[in-house]
Design a protein with these regions (language model features):
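Membrane-proximal helix-turn-helix segments that form the acceptor-binding/catalytic region
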Residues: 102-110, 125, 133, 142, ...
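A charged, aromatic-enriched C-terminal amphipathic alpha-helix characteristic of glycosyltransferases
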Residues: 354-360, 371-404
Length: 410
């Protein structure tokens, strides 16, 4: 089970130089023997496991070196456990960087890797410390799927963290980001000219079986308007917006929550839901197995996030854009965000302005009386190429091979 509330089924198969990956069977063949040391931040995280599966499915040899927050099940790759980490315990995580680096520097699979992939800043620091101890020249890829709140602070602590990241970024072979917003608002302002980036959106993995996409003319399930909030249930403001929407519209609407709530952010969760007959919490779900049934009844999915307002929340592109898009469920999102830019660029959702406490109920009430805008967005979603929502086969192989080839030319 991941931080986003999903469980991954292991049985399923900057302007500083931005590029978009493409499929390539030849690339998969070329990298059949390439050896990857993958440093993930949490072996139990579904997104980490999906990435490892994608690397393996593209013919790469992967050895994982990862801590865990929950005891992981079904480790389906060669793996060295780096111990347990605790969310928010930064002193413990700092110590683990040095202890983990010592272990890595002595591991044959790390020393013999063709490329190192480090997911988040902790693991990037560990990778370079291990390289230093082992005196290696192995290229490192920095995989950045969120810009941590410590990196966006305006005080001395934030400046120190950005300085550390800058030093590491300058030594990486590539930076993989899941949103162009991270490049525009973080990497370019602070690390311009020091990196080469690849855009790696949070698309569904090519190896998974999610079932067919819905038909364009599929009939809506009768009943009240159904709005979903899917994935990482971490935003207190979103939670309150949806509860208020349920209170205002009563039996005309159902709110469906899928995932696991972030207890540090939303301290009172179940009691608020239990007070309302039209709010339903479904708990954890398994991706990709449950996605078709999860999205099938929904009329729209909420795609707003304010947990790190003014920073990461405005720059990211959430999984639900791609999951919902594949199944033809239009997103509703606030303007002024990277998510809104994505929706506008694809013409596949509905945008709303502040104040959301007023505009969201008005919007949903309007969609209930006239569903034409929603149906139009649904048709545009289903008319999009599958590749908009699903990662092409061979993408991981192409990206890794480009780094290996570059190293060989030096």
């Amino acid at each position: 089970m991941a931080d986003d509330g999903t469980t991954f089924d292991a049985s399923l198969t900057g302007q500083g130089g931005l590029g978009r990956a493409h499929a390539g069977a030849m690339a998969a063949h070329r990298t059949a023997l390439a050896k990857v040391a993958y440093l993930g931040h949490d072996a139990s995280d579904a997104a980490v496991r999906r990435r490892v599966r994608a690397l393996l499915d593209d013919g790469l040899s992967v050895t994982g070196f990862m801590p865990h927050r929950r005891k992981p099940k079904d480790i389906f790759w060669p793996h060295t456990d780096l111990g347990e980490t605790r969310d928010g315990d930064f002193l413990q995580r700092l110590r683990s960087i040095f202890s983990g680096a010592g272990l890595l520097s002595r591991a044959d699979a790390f020393r013999g890797a063709d490329v190192i992939i480090a997911r988040n800043l902790d693991m990037l620091a560990m990778a370079f410390e291990a390289k230093r101890r082992a005196r290696l020249s192995t290229p490192v890829i920095y995989e950045c799927l969120d810009v941590h709140r410590l990196l966006t602070r305006t005080d001395a602590a934030g400046g120190l963290m950005r300085s550390l990241e800058r030093a590491f970024v300058a030594r990486t072979a590539r930076v993989w980001v899941s949103s162009p917003g991270f490049l525009e608002h973080h990497f370019e302002p602070y690390h311009s000219g020091r990196y080469t980036a690849e855009l790696m959106e949070n698309r569904l993995p090519a190896s998974s079986e999610f079932g067919p996409r819905p038909e364009l003319d599929a009939e809506r399930t009768p009943g009240p308007f159904r709005l979903g909030w899917v994935g990482n249930l971490r935003c207190l403001r979103s939670f309150h917006l949806l509860l208020d929407l349920a209170d205002r519209l009563g039996g005309e609407i159902e709110i469906h929550l899928h995932g696991v709530p972030a207890r540090r952010e939303i301290e009172v969760f179940e009691p608020e839901i239990d007070r309302r007959d039209n709010v339903h919490f479904h708990g954890r779900y398994q991706a990709p197995d449950d996605l078709a049934d999860l999205y099938a009844p929904l009329d729209a999915v909420w795609a707003g996030d304010f947990m790190e307002a003014g920073a990461n929340s405005e720059w990211l592109l959430p999984n639900r854009l791609y999951e919902g898009g594949y199944f033809g469920v239009p997103p509703i999102a606030p303007t002024g965000t990277q998510t809104a830019n994505w929706i506008k660029g694809h013409g596949t959702g509905i945008l709303i302005d502040e104040p959301l406490d007023d505009s969201l109920p008005v919007l949903v009430a309007g969609l209930m009386s006239d569903s034409a805008p929603l149906q139009s967005a649904r048709r545009r979603l289903l008319a999009q190429s599958e590749e908009v929502f699903v990662e092409p086969r061979g993408e991981m192989a192409r990206l890794v091979q480009s780094v290996v080839d570059e190293m060989a030319r030096r």
